[in-house]
From Swiss-Prot:
Species of the source: Glaesserella parasuis serovar 5 (strain SH0165) (Haemophilus parasuis)
Function, as annotated: Specifically methylates guanosine-37 in various tRNAs.
Binding sites annotated in the UniProt record for S-adenosyl-L-methionine: 117, 137-142
Gene Ontology, cellular component aspect: cytosol
GO molecular function: tRNA (guanine(37)-N1)-methyltransferase activity
The protein's name: tRNA (guanine-N(1)-)-methyltransferase
CDD domains linked to this entry: TrmD-like
Localization per Swiss-Prot or TrEMBL: Cytoplasm
Keywords on record: Cytoplasm, Methyltransferase, S-adenosyl-L-methionine, Transferase, tRNA processing
Catalyzed reactions per annotation: guanosine(37) in tRNA + S-adenosyl-L-methionine = N(1)-methylguanosine(37) in tRNA + S-adenosyl-L-homocysteine + H(+)
Oligomer and partners: Homodimer.
Cited Pfam families: tRNA_m1G_MT
Amino acid sequence: MWIGIISLFPEMFKAITDFGVTGRAVKQNLLQVQCWNPRDFTHDKHKTVDDRPYGGGPGMLMMVQPLRDAIREAKATACKEDGVEAKVIYLSPQGRKLDQAGVQTLATNQKLILVCGRYEGIDERLIQTEIDEEWSIGDYVLTGGELPAMTLIDAVARFIPGVLGKQTSALEDSFAEGLLDCPHYTRPEVLDGLPVPQVLMSGHHEQIRKWRLEQSLKRTWLRRPELLDSLALTDEQRVLLNNIKKRHKSVNSRT
C-alpha cells in the first residue's frame, strides 16, 4: 500500500515509518509512506501557510495555494507509475467516525492521500474540489490532523498482507467481527493468586474457541452493548448471549 501525507509537520510520521509493526512494514516495502509539506509550495520568503478567514472570527485557516499545490503534487505522484489514482482523505472532526468496518474498507485501497489540517481547518472549497472523503477518529478536537492520520495508517496497515506475523491476528482483533476481544493470558500460570482459566490449558481447540466467543460476547454486552444492536448474530452466538444474560441476572438477584 502507498500512502501520501500532506502535513506541516512531516517529521511526526517517523513514529510510523521508523518504529514497530508499521516501521517493519516500511522496511519490507509492504507499506510506502511519502510526505509533502505545504510550506515547500509557498512563494514568499516567510513561507506563509496560514491566512485569515472571511467573516472574521478567531484563528486562522491553512492558506489555499500551498495546500492545494501540495495535494495536487501528491495526486500526480500517486498515479505516475501505474495510472491508479489515490483516494484523498481529510482528517476532520466533521468526518465519518473511524471504526473497524471503515478501516477494513479503507484497507482495500491501493493508495491513499491523507491531508492533515492545522489551525482552524481548511477552505471548504478545497474539501469540495480536492477531497474524496472526510474521516474523524472521535468527537473531540486536536491541534492537527497528524495524530488521526497516524492512527488511520496504523489501523489500515494491519490488513496489508504480510504486515502481521499471522493475517488471522487482524481478523481476531477487537471489532473485527463486531465484538470486543476476549481476555488473553500468558505466563506465569498463576499471577498474584489469579490463575489462567483452565480451559485455555486444556488443549481442546473447540472448547477454547467456544470460551473465547463467549467471553467476547460477555465483554461486548457488559461494556459496549450498543455494538450488538447492529450485528446479525449466529444461532450459536444468540444461545451463548442468552445464557450470559441469564447467569448475570441470576447473580444480581442474589446480591
